[in-house]
Amino acid sequence: YIDSSAIVSDSWLRGYGESDVKQGSFSNQNGSTAKVNFLTSAERAFSDEDAEGFVKDLKSIPCKLVCIMPNKDISLEKYLNELTADRLLNLPTTVSPTDFTNVSIPEFSVESSGSIKKNLENIGITTIFSSDADFSKGFAENLILNDVTQAVSISVNKNGISSDNQSEADKNAPKTEEGLVLDRPFIYAVVDNESYLPVIIGTVSNL
């Protein structure tokens, strides 16, 4: 049994100005609609046949925010059930370093705590829960791992992630005509810049 908590706090590499924050509507998973603040900026976007998303760099720590929104005809639950570890890690790497899209993301805060064993198994991480798992390099005793729980608290706003620090708005960032608006349930993750392994991962279903 492992109990872990994840804390990330940093400002954006390219921040938001006051004119980049506007109220809009978010279509909740439960069928209701919420009025929330949306943050708009030019970011590197990606897409495939089932989803689209973007990456946004953090200023100080070697991580970035990744958001993935399934297409309108695919529910978040269905997308998660079919999501593999390879797809999760590879999809954000398809972004172009020079092509930017206007992206609008809602401000959100999420607090959750519970078992992530099923989530890990769904993306192919199963050996650690079997008798074949070898933890001898880290522990003197023979251990069997039967569950992993994680407590996550994250807030995404115009200043950064779980951060009260002001980030400087980049008025020289390139702009495009097309846009991506995350106005329905999506996946968020804070990932390592090199490996794209998630430090924090979760979903925004209702605001």
Segments predicted by a language model, with ranges:
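Non-catalytic, conformational "gating/processing" segments within enzyme and secreted inhibitor domains
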Residues: 1-71, 78, 97-173
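Short linear sequence elements within intrinsically disordered, low-complexity coil regions
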Residues: 31, 84, 140, 191-193
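Extended hydrophobic
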Residues: 48, 52-68, 172-207
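Short, glycine- and charge-enriched coil/turn segments that flank and shape catalytic ligand pockets
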Residues: 73-74, 177
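A general marker of short, structured functional hotspots
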Residues: 75, 131, 182-184
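Phosphate-binding glycine-rich loops and adjacent basic patches that engage nucleotide phosphates
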Residues: 76-83
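Short, cationic low-complexity segments
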Residues: 84-98, 176-180
